[in-house]
Amino acid sequence: DIQMTQTPSSLSASLGDRVTISCRASQDINNYLNWYRQKPDGTVKLLIYYTSRLHSGVPSRFSGSGSGTDYSLTISNLEQEDISTYFCQQGNALPRTFGGGTKLEIKR
C-alpha cells in the first residue's frame, strides 16, 4: 500500500492568515492527490482533486499544488468556518490511502 505522511498533525493560526499543509507519498502518485476536510460535526467534504482542481462550490481561498510524491494544500485569508481536520488521499492505486490528518484551530 502507498503510505501518506501528512504534516503538521495540528496547526493554530489567526483569522486572515495563510496556512499550508503538506502531504508526502511513499511513491509517485502521478498527481492523483485529493484533499478533504472533516468539520467538527463530522461532515466530510471534498475540497480539491487531482492535485489542484477545486471541487464545485469550494472558494478560491483554497489551492493545491505538487507533483510526484510531494503535495500541499494552502488556505489563504483564514476564516472561522475553516476550523476542521484536513486529510490528503491518494487515488493512484488501491487501496486509496489517507494521510493522518491535520487539525486546524483558530488562535484566540
UniProtKB/Swiss-Prot annotation:
Note down the stretches annotated as region Complementarity-determining-1.
24-34
Entries under InterPro entries matching the protein: Ig-like_dom (IPR007110), Ig-like_dom_sf (IPR036179), Ig-like_fold (IPR013783), Ig_sub (IPR003599), Ig_V-set (IPR013106), IgV_Light_Chain (IPR050150)
Indicate yes or no for the key word Protein biosynthesis. no
Give the UniProt record's GO annotations in the biological process aspect. adaptive immune response; immune response
Please provide the record's keywords in A-Z order.
Adaptive immunity, Disulfide bond, Immunity, Immunoglobulin
Annotated region described as Complementarity-determining-3, given as residue ranges? 89-97
Alphabetical list of PROSITE patterns matching this protein? IG_LIKE
Enumerate the residue ranges of region (Framework-4). 98-108
Region ranges (Framework-1): 1-23
Pfam families assigned to the protein according to its UniProt record, in alphabetical order:
V-set (PF07686)
Q: Where is this region: Framework-2?
A: 35-49
Q: Where are the transmembrane segments?
A: none
State the SUPFAM superfamilies in the record. Answer: Immunoglobulin
Return the PANTHER family for the record.
IMMUNOGLOBULIN LIGHT CHAIN
Further comment: Anti-arsonate hybridoma protein.
Q: What is this protein called?
A: Ig kappa chain V-V region HP 91A3
Organism (species): Mus musculus
Q: What is the lineage of its organism?
A: Eukaryota, Metazoa, Chordata, Craniata, Vertebrata
